Swiss-Prot record:
It comes from Drosophila pseudoobscura pseudoobscura. Coiled coil: none annotated. The gene is foxo. The keyword 4Fe-4S does not apply. This is Forkhead box protein O. The modification Phosphothreonine is found at T49. Residues 350-359 have a biased composition (Pro residues).
Length: 644
């Protein structure tokens, strides 16, 4: 047997050249090799690293020594090597086994710090202790082979709460590492989680575990009525959030599709399914069951919901309370008068009173309730009382609008006999009974018309005052834009006025007018007077608007004149500059022409001089040639001998 392996080396069957070992038997001693004939080659373990494989018949003892379970206790100063050997002997059959023994890096660091006299060591001192006291690290102290285990020691120091870092007193020195006496025994929490609120997280997790245990003991099953798989986490299927105010009552569960980070799909690939867990209905999306009659809500849950609804109602802004009260009072008076007129005239069976008045903003919420009107209900429950439509606009009632005639048209014989019963769902008389007392209803409708005319007169009087005040505010307030008051939206009618006279009059006052409109006393024949007054007020407002437009036009004209003057001045300056530039260009061209003429004259003079020089030179050469010719000595020939 060899050290470090669980079985013998396999025997060789062939040599490096491919020859079988049995063929060499004749060469080695002339016989067969002992122990090599008839045996198959044995397999070798693939991994020869730590930890070594255990034997097949090994049984781990059930109980371990208590002294080996808690490794955070401080060791007394003494022989550290003996302490390590004792720990190795105690943990001989433990599940954690390393190349140097059965102790982890954290245990070794704990022994190293505990063996120091002052119970503190620096990082370099911990390295030295490892090399000196652990046999495995004795030959791994150099820089090449110590990078791995030194990195592991640094990680264990920073990630375990049992070790505490203390600043060194000296400058430029590494910090001290000490044992934390307040550390909890057992597996410590990683220090990386210290950035989170660990205490709050631990409390919340503990409460959630207790609640889950209580639900399991009571036999509460998850939302899907299926037993969870063993690999599923505790929080999956029972998602509780105790910190939420809605869930403080307990037992409020979310959808089973919601999962926390711990129960991700990456760790539960075997439980994935392409089919959705549950087809959620709109009621299930909010966590409430379908059967609303059997729902049970705790008191805390109900209080939380009431607080939420109260806060939401406070934030909503409705219309002005004073306007609501006035409209409600007017509506109640009209309803009482209508009821008195119908009951006194016809003697119909007692009907329930109509519903109270509601502002226009809340009519959409009451669409499913039956409405009461004189013109009959509209399909779908959208018909509202006629005075509500009149109260929606203040300006229409002051003019000759069709809104005022709706109530009168609704009291025709046909409408009374055909549309009274559907408005009141509690009483539905037959057509014969309606025909019998339809005449009586028509007799009593005359009183109703008189009362309604009086009410309309009062309303028109109030609306006239409001309308005039609005017109004055729009005209006199300079901060408001003129677009808010648009006469095109109102059916004014045929108004005749002399625009030129108005313009001349307002131009004389420079557009500064102080408008004071006296309120006329309204008699019983109010509709015609109101129409005349309204037309006059509208004409005055239109004249004021035209005056403002004329002032604007005059100011715009003055500004236009100034702009024209500035433009003319600019044009004159530009023309002067252009003339000056043209003069400069002409002067420059004249100078260039003079220079060119001078150059031409110089060239002509040079050419004449050169021709004279050439002529003189040729004459001189001719003279020289003549001189040479005549300066040669003449040859004197002697006379002949016969001349004496």
């Amino acid at each position: 047997m060899m050290d470090g392996f669980a079985q013998d080396w396999p025997t060789l069957t062939h040599t490096d050249n491919g020859l079988a070992m049995d063929q060499l038997s004749g060469v080695v001693g002339g016989g067969d090799l002992p122990g090599d004939v008839g045996f198959e080659p044995q397999t070798r373990a693939r991994s020869n690293t730590w930890p070594c494989p255990r034997p097949e018949n090994f049984v781990e003892p059930p109980d371990e020594l208590d002294s080996t379970k808690a490794s955070n206790q401080q060791l007394a100063a003494g022989d550290s090597q003996q302490a390590i050997q004792n720990a190795n002997a105690a943990k001989k059959n433990s599940s954690r086994r390393n190349a140097w023994g059965n102790l982890s890096y954290a245990d070794l660091i704990t022994h190293a710090i505990g063996s120091a006299t002052d119970k503190r060591l620096t990082l370099s001192q911990i390295y030295e202790w490892m090399v000196q006291n652990v046999p495995y690290f004795k030959d791994k102290g150099d820089s090449n082979s110590s990078a791995g285990w030194k990195n592991s020691i640094r990680h264990n120091l920073s990630l375990h709460n049992r070790f505490m870092r203390v600043q060194n007193e000296g400058t430029g020195k590494s910090s001290w590492w000490m044992l934390n006496p307040e550390a909890k025994p057992g597996k410590s929490v990683r220090r990386r989680a210290a950035s989170m609120e660990t205490s709050r997280y631990e409390k919340r997790r503990g409460r959630a575990k207790k609640r889950v245990e209580a639900l399991r003991q009571a036999g509460v099953v998850g939302l899907n009525d299926a037993t969870p798989s063993p690999s599923s986490s505790v929080s999956e299927g029972l998602d509780h959030f105790p910190e939420s105010p809605l869930h403080s009552g307990g037992g409020f569960q979310l959808s089973p599709d919601f999962r926390q980070r711990a129960s991700s799909n990456a760790s539960s690939c075997g439980r994935l399914s392409p089919i959705r867990a549950q087809d959620l209905e709109p009621q299930d999306l909010w966590g409430f069951p379908v059967d609303y009659q059997n729902t049970t809500m705790t008191q805390a849950h109900a209080q939380a919901l009431e607080e939420l609804t109260g806060s939401m109602a406070d934030e909503l802004t409705l219309c002005n309370q004073q306007q609501q009260q006035q409209q409600q009072q007017q509506q109640q008076q009209q309803q009482q008068q209508q009821q008195q007129g119908f009951s006194a005239a016809s003697g119909l069976p007692s009907q329930p009173p109509p519903p109270p008045y509601q502002p226009p903003q809340l009519q959409q919420q009451q669409q499913q309730q039956p409405s009461y009107s004189l013109n009959g209900p509209a399909p779908g429950g959208y018909q509202t009382l006629q005075p509500q439509s009149q109260s929606q606009c203040l300006l229409h009632r002051s003019l000759n609008c069709s809104c005022l005639h709706n109530a009168r048209d609704g009291l025709s014989p046909n409408s009374v006999t055909t549309t009274m019963s559907p408005a009141y769902p509690n009483s539905e008389p037959s057509s014969d009974s309606l025909n019998t007392y339809s005449n009586v209803v028509l007799d009593g409708s005359s009183d109703l018309l008189v009362q309604q005319q009086q009410q309309q007169q009062l309303q028109q009087q109030q609306v006239k005052v409001e309308f005039e005040g609005q017109c004055l505010e729009v005209l006199n307030n300079e901060a408001q834009p003129i677009d808010e008051f648009n006469l095109e939206n109102f059916p004014v009618g045929n108004l005749e006025c002399n625009v030129e006279e108005l313009l001349q009059q307002e131009m004389s006052y420079d557009g500064l007018l102080d408008i004071n409109i006296p309120l006329a006393n309204v008699s019983t024949n109010a509709p015609l007077v109101n129409l005349v007054n309204n037309s006059t007020t509208l004409s005055s407002s239109s004249s004021n608007l035209s005056g403002s437009t004329t002032t604007l036009s005059s100011s715009s004209l003055s500004a236009a004149v100034q702009l024209n003057q500035l433009q003319a001045q600019l044009q004159q300056q530009q023309q002067q500059q252009q003339q000056h530039l043209q003069q400069q260009q002409q002067h420059h061209q004249h100078q260039q022409q003079l220079l060119l003429n001078n150059n031409n004259n110089n060239n002509n003079n040079n050419s004449s001089n050169s021709s004279l020089d050439l002529a003189t030179q040729t004459a001189a050469t001719n003279l020289n040639a003549a001189r040479v010719q005549y300066s040669q000595p003449s040859v004197v020939t002697s006379p002949p001998s016969w001349v004496h």
